[in-house]
């Protein structure tokens, strides 16, 4: 719903809010902190989505759809890359397929924008999008998050999804993913965790991914080293920045 400082996109759009902690990559999720802040400010959409645990905001597991937000992309006349649901997961089990279909309709009717949808639940993405009534949209990039080798199976699920562009976000990268199969994955984003309690990202893990991308023809985007002060840590790798974007496949 707003312009964003996220390096690989231009704006965020949140027709859904709230989520459930799923795997290790969720532990320090920035969206939990942001949702708690918005809840404290009295923003109705975020009421009841987080709770305090050990002094930190955690998801309650409650998910809210926001039909009013469906009109937002049409108001944007300037074409932009749009990160869909930076504050949730469109393919959370509690998001009705009918609502996902409404989101799809909005994307189809605003082809000037490029939509980037990221999920930790690619198995549901595949199940919903292969029902036969979700067209493959050339302006919809579909991706999954992979934080370590324990969840590499998400890439196999993503490959089942019919998509113009498939991508993987390896952020927060908290372990090696050496040996990952990037076949038919068009774009890889790599980033270290940032903020309180950020876990260290080993440079070797990043270089492994960059080499895998070269072998598979996958565009490589290095987002950040992360840490408590991500700006100070920067986003250069081996003396340069990597801002590659995928080429359209259909």
Task: Please tell me what each predicted stretch does.
Residues 1-21, 38-42, 160-163, 174, ...:
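Auxiliary Fe-S-binding modules of radical SAM enzymes
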Residues 1-81, 89:
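N-terminal [4Fe-4S]-dependent radical SAM core
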Residues 25, 30, 43-46, 99-101, ...:
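General N-terminal targeting signals
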Residues 35, 39, 53-54, 58, ...:
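Small/flexible residues
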Residues 39, 46-49, 104, 127, ...:
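Solvent-exposed, non-transmembrane amphipathic alpha-helical segments
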Residues 44, 50-55, 128, 132, ...:
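Short alpha-helical interface elements
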Residues 64-219:
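Conserved AdoMet/S-adenosylmethionine-binding subsite of the radical SAM
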């Amino acid at each position: 719903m707003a312009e964003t400082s996220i390096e690989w996109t231009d704006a965020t759009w949140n027709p859904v809010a709230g989520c459930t902690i799923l795997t290790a990559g969720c532990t320090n999720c920035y969206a939990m902190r942001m949702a708690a802040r918005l809840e404290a400010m009295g923003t109705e959409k975020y009421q009841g989505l987080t709770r305090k645990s050990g002094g930190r905001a955690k998801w309650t597991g409650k998910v809210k759809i926001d039909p009013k937000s469906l009109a937002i992309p049409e108001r944007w006349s300037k074409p932009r890359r749009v990160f869909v649901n930076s504050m949730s997961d469109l393919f959370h089990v509690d998001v009705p397929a009918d609502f996902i279909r409404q989101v799809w309709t909005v994307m189809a009717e605003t082809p000037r924008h490029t939509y980037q949808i990221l999920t930790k639940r690619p198995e549901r993405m595949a199940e919903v999008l292969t029902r036969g009534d979700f067209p493959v949209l050339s302006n919809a990039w579909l991706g999954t998050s992979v934080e370590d080798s324990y969840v590499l199976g998400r890439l196999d699920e993503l490959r089942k999804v019919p998509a113009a562009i498939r991508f993987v976000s390896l952020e927060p990268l908290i372990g090696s993913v050496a040996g990952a199969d990037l076949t038919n994955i068009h774009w890889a984003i790599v980033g270290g965790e940032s903020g309180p309690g950020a876990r260290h990202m080993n440079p070797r893990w990043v270089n492994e991914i960059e080499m895998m991308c070269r072998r598979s023809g996958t565009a490589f985007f290095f987002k950040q080293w992360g840490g408590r002060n991500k700006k100070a840590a920067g986003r250069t790798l081996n003396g340069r920045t990597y801002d590659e974007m995928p080429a359209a496949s259909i």
